[in-house]
Amino acid sequence: MADTTGRIPLWVIGTVAGILVIGIIGIFFYGSYSGLGSSL
């Protein structure tokens, strides 16, 4: 595995950021298509 010298590995940041972005976009579009996103 990669040597972590106290810092968070860049791939971890990228993975978490990607999951958050996809999750937020997914919830937004799901709410829009469900008719619940109009109030957001």
Swiss-Prot record:
| Superkingdom of source | Eukaryota
> Has UniProt tagged this entry with the keyword Thylakoid?
yes
The question of whether Transcription regulation is a record keyword is answered with no
Main localisation: plastid
Enumerate the Pfam families for this protein.
PsbJ (PF01788)
What's its job?
A: One of the components of the core complex of photosystem II (PSII). PSII is a light-driven water:plastoquinone oxidoreductase that uses light energy to abstract electrons from H(2)O, generating O(2) and a proton gradient subsequently used for ATP formation. It consists of a core antenna complex that captures photons, and an electron transfer chain that converts photonic excitation into a charge separation.
Assembly notes: PSII is composed of 1 copy each of membrane proteins PsbA, PsbB, PsbC, PsbD, PsbE, PsbF, PsbH, PsbI, PsbJ, PsbK, PsbL, PsbM, PsbT, PsbX, PsbY, PsbZ, Psb30/Ycf12, at least 3 peripheral proteins of the oxygen-evolving complex and a large number of cofactors. It forms dimeric complexes.
Question: Which PANTHER family does the record associate with it?
Answer: PHOTOSYSTEM II REACTION CENTER PROTEIN J (PTHR34812:SF3)
Protein's recorded name: Photosystem II reaction center protein J
State the species of origin.
Lobularia maritima (Sweet alyssum)
Q: What is the lineage of its organism?
A: Eukaryota, Viridiplantae, Streptophyta, Embryophyta, Tracheophyta
